[in-house]
UniProtKB/Swiss-Prot annotation:
InterPro entries: FAD/NAD-bd_sf (IPR036188), MQO (IPR006231). The lineage of its organism: Bacteria, Bacillati, Bacillota, Bacilli, Bacillales. It comes from the Bacteria. PANTHER family: L-2-HYDROXYGLUTARATE DEHYDROGENASE, MITOCHONDRIAL. It comes from Exiguobacterium sp. (strain ATCC BAA-1283 / AT1b). Its EC number is 1.1.5.4. One of its GO terms (molecular function) is 2-hydroxyglutarate dehydrogenase activity. Pathway: Carbohydrate metabolism; tricarboxylic acid cycle; oxaloacetate from (S)-malate (quinone route): step 1/1. GO terms for biological process: tricarboxylic acid cycle. This is Probable malate:quinone oxidoreductase. Belongs to the MQO family.
Amino acid sequence: MSSTQTRTDVILIGAGIMSATLGSLFKELVPEWNIKVFEKLDAAGEESSNEWNNAGTGHAALCELNYTTENADGTIDISKAVNVNEQFQISRQFWAHLVKQGLIENPGAFIRSIPHMSMVQGEKNVDFLKRRLEALTTNPLFEGMVLSDDPSQLQEWIPLIMDGRTSDEPIAATKIDSGTDVNFGALTRMLFDHLTSNGVELNYGHSVEDVKRLENGHWEVKVKDMSQNTIETHTAPFLFIGGGGGSLPLLQKTGIPESKQIGGFPVSGLFLVCKNREVIEQHHAKVYGKAKVGAPPMSVPHLDTRFIDGRKELLFGPFAGFTPKFLKTGSNLDLIRSVKPNNVITMLAAGAKEMPLTKYLIEQVLLSHDKRMDELREFIPNAKNEDWEIVVAGQRVQVIKDTPQGKGTLQFGTEVVSSEDGSVAALLGASPGASTAVHVMLKVLEQCFPQHLPEWEPKIKEMVPSYGLKLSEHPDLFKTIHESTAITLGLEEKDMVHN
């Protein structure tokens, strides 16, 4: 097995949406830097970013009830919802910039307008939804959201969900037309097409075997060319690990102090996919329900209109599965290999504390097709077993770490881990993930390149006009940006968004 050695400015591990976004930011800010990308698979965006491996929701907290929690006094805390929405607005602005500059074309291939709805049943839940609407609509980011508990109005909005519904239990839904369906696989491929045409070296079929820091502070990455069965050694002063579920083992190999006391717990997602075109055409929205009491946030059920390869699809889920793999294409030894002396206490503490999650996963794994269909019928009463089939989506590795709240705390979100000197950063976690990619990668730049920020800031503000500001505190700017990005991205948003 022969070996070669080369040096570059930036190494990106993984050809998913995160590396594609960071690479695109670098190309705009420092076009002269040399960038190399290493991807184990044969194409870009094939793991978590692939359109069949995630929900495709442009997460802006318009419909996801887990981002708005109820306080003890009955008030609704919308801070997390505002935060997620702000982050999605940053992504919209950057994507619109790339389209305007002609760096990516045909935005309709990766983003479409689709109403985002929250639907609940039962008196208590309807009351919660009404209070949630009141709280959200005090904020300009959620202007245009409306609620109805009138069955005839709901029949217009969501006929597939209302047809055959015999229960007299109260039901209500909120609706906002500025929601989006995002094909992150298509977007990832577009971004890498742009990058490779501008000198970025993208290496498929290259597996990163080891990572180590050199005496000069640079990073040495040992890469196996799987087609040639050769080992290559590449060095760079900056390394980004964006390998989805595969990021944690590579972060551990860096040996940086920040990688200690961090573990990962893999959860696979499954969706029911509709095979009946007549049924698919009856629904046009992303409708999110409320997680059952005691169920984790990842379990929020939703019925989604999707656009994949230009074709309308209908998916319901997620259902959870379990495999010890950290990637769909990973190894059954991934979980056990990730347990190290520095995180074993963290992992054991999480195991002891997260019994409800363990119980939930066991119940989910044991679900039959009939049982999954019963859950779907809570959304679509007339759903027929033969119209739906199960597909296995991507692996989500939930971060486990020690926090002020205690050891072994399970984190639901997306997290950047970087070294103190800013020479290496890794992206861990799950939802809202890809929707907030631009915000998260700007955070990487802030943490790892503080010395460059003063010179980069004018260009960043050109790409993301609201950079450094909270749009929720600048309603006029939000309205201007939201309308201009909608036009550039070809989003057909109704006038009610800003009435």
